[in-house]
Curated annotation (Swiss-Prot):
Other facts: This protein is sulfur-rich (Met and Cys rich).
Keywords: Disulfide bond, Knottin
Disulfide cross-links: 59-75, 63-78, 69-92
Keyword Transport listed: no
Organism field: Solanum lycopersicum (Tomato)
Identification of the protein by name: Fruit-specific protein
Domain comment (free text): The presence of a 'disulfide through disulfide knot' structurally defines this protein as a knottin.
Keyword Disulfide bond attributed: yes
Tissue: Fruit specific.
Amino acid sequence: MAAKNSEMKFAIFFVVLLTTTLVDMSGISKMQVMALRDIPPQETLLKMKLLPTNILGLCNEPCSSNSDCIGITLCQFCKEKTDQYGLTYRTCNLLP
């Protein structure tokens, strides 16, 4: 009985060791991510067109017309704004 328990413990240890070795060798833990703190408005608009995840229609989301701001939100007006560099862009806003 004691021999079976020790064999079972060794088998579990071996499986855990093999799994952690394979995961480490696959390079998942070595993945590097580069992020920007302030994304320029042009890239934000591109993100909005390519990845439309805004189902609820949040405030300050990029838009091109009022129809882009529809959803379950109070901010249903697309308003033009200017950033600190003088570039103009449009976001969903509470007031027209």
